Curated annotation (Swiss-Prot):
It is found in: Secreted. The keyword Secreted applies. Belongs to the gastrin/cholecystokinin family. Magainin subfamily. It comes from the Eukaryota. GO terms for biological process: defense response. This is Peptide PGLa-R5. The lineage of its organism: Eukaryota, Metazoa, Chordata, Craniata, Vertebrata. The modification Leucine amide is found at L21. Keywords: Amidation, Amphibian defense peptide, Antimicrobial, Secreted. Expressed by the skin glands. One of its GO terms (cellular component) is extracellular region. Antimicrobial peptide.
């Protein structure tokens, strides 16, 4: 649902942010 989709997107963004550090 919406919650799982948002969590997936946030997870991807977090991985990208961590990779950029």
């Amino acid at each position: 649902g919406m919650a799982s989709t948002a969590g997936s997107v946030l997870g991807k963004l977090a991985k990208v942010a961590i990779g950029a550090l």
